[in-house]
Amino acid sequence: EKALSNICSNQALCALRALIHLCLLGKTGLEATARACFSKAEYLKSRLDFVELLNEGPTFNEFAVRLPREADGVIAALRGKGFLPGLPLAAMGRGGPNDLLIAVTEKRTREELDVFAEALREACHD
């Protein structure tokens, strides 16, 4: 019989892609990437003094915040400005309507994080 899905080949391609990426990063590249994600997430957290952090402990590259207004409205406002601000936790059954999960990667610069923080501030107070 012919398979109805190509999930196995998709998994193999994803694994191959991950392997190539890790090889290109080199011996210390994964550690450097992880450190960059961590430090940039901590930097962004320090810029978000107008929201409540839902976890005061250390995080890696994601953290949850409670916004002063509903997350869906803030997300819509920021998407209109070209940002993908995060995931509303309520949609995942993990929080209230004002809770947002934000992720930061090594690809974002501090300048980009500053622009995002200011846009988020404006969206929260519109």
Residue ranges and their predicted role:
Residues 23-26, 38, 42, 49, ...:
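Hydrophobic alpha-helix feature that most strongly marks membrane-spanning transmembrane helices
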Residues 91-126:
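PLP-dependent enzyme catalytic core of the Aspartate aminotransferase-like
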Residues 51-81:
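Conserved PLP-binding catalytic core of the aspartate aminotransferase-like
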Residues 56-58, 81-101:
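Conserved PLP cofactor-binding pocket of PLP-dependent enzymes
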Residues 1-48, 53-56, 60:
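Active-site C-terminal subdomain of aminotransferase-like
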